Amino acid sequence: MNDLPDRFPRGWFVLGHQRDFPVGETKTIFGFNNKILISRSEDSLITVDVDGDTSWPVLELNQMVMVWHDLEKQDPDFIPDKIDACYSDDWSDYGMASFLVKNNCRELIDNMADKGHFGPVHQAPFEGFWNEAKDHTYTQEMTADSPILGRDLFSQARYEGPA
């Protein structure tokens, strides 16, 4: 077992979909090794209470509610990009699922650079693989040929702010 304390990166973290937080209700989730209370007031503003601290910045964007985490209590230094498709009637509404992943979120972004796992894990051995890290974003493009998922696969993934 590791005796080091959990550390969480600085950045925006999604707490849930906007519709998960109706007016007048308070939801409780666990994150950052704390109980987090999320409330939407009668004037539709979201507040977040992390172990009695209500100063955490909150953002509603792309139909998600996010909270800014920074151990040094610095203000946010970026805002995620607005995704126009989240507000378009051309797309159906999306859902969100929550499940426990027993590792630190920093390890998830490491997956982006591990091109060797795509064959054995996803049954999609890569043919082309490209990554770019710029400011708070990480973009990956990959081409693959999978007998299960289909030929000539193309994937573009973009991650913003922590993992």
Regions found by a protein language model. Give the residues of each.
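N-terminal pre-ligand scaffold of iron-sulfur
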Residues: 1-49, 54-61, 67-69
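C-terminal catalytic domain of Rieske-type non-heme iron oxygenases
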Residues: 57, 73-163
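Residue-level signal for tight coil/turn positions that link beta-strands
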Residues: 33, 42, 62, 103, ...
